[in-house]
């Protein structure tokens, strides 16, 4: 088995621990994945998220810096690093990261919510209100998109059932 395969296995073990909120073992597995594959950006991002859940924002920031160093267009890494900066009281850096994440992905509702929360905490109520409006708008769009996708699937399913029923009728 190659190092990449082993790294992937360790990553999957780590994510299973993350889902079960076992962040210590999660971090151990993800660290092993990173040793096996130092360019495994998703392992760094996931380990950073686990550090964030353990309230270790400095370690989280270090991992998110690695991800951003590997891929400066990773909106999620900027968002998560912004959350970590906010936990350390570095609110200007947090806002910068939230803004950068939104430059990269303008429909990233979670970032609008995070930025709204921080702006509200800082007394920037107009900006916070504007961001909450965006969260609401994006939520409505997502619900509509989901509904449309579900309707398309249902229409296709009904067409398949119709063809199947026609085939059965022809066989009789």
Show which residues each predicted segment covers.
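Alpha-helical tetratricopeptide repeat
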Residues: 1-172
């Amino acid at each position: 088995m190659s190092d990449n395969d082993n790294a992937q296995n360790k990553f999957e073990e780590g994510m299973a621990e993350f889902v079960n909120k076992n962040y210590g073992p999660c971090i151990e597995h993800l660290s092993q994945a990173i040793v096996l594959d130092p360019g495994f950006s998703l392992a760094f991002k996931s380990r950073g998220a686990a550090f964030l859940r353990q309230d270790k924002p400095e370690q989280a920031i270090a991992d998110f810096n690695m991800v951003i160093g590997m891929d400066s267009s990773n909106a999620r890494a900027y968002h998560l690093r912004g959350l970590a900066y906010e936990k350390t009281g570095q609110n200007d850096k947090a806002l910068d990261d939230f803004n950068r994440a939104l430059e990269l992905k303008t429909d990233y509702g979670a970032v609008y919510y995070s930025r709204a929360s921080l702006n509200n905490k800082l007394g920037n109520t107009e900006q916070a209100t504007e961001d909450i409006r965006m969260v609401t708008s994006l939520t409505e769009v997502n619900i509509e998109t989901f509904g449309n996708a579900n309707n398309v699937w249902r229409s296709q399913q009904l067409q398949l059932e119709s063809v199947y029923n026609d085939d059965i009728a022809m066989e009789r």
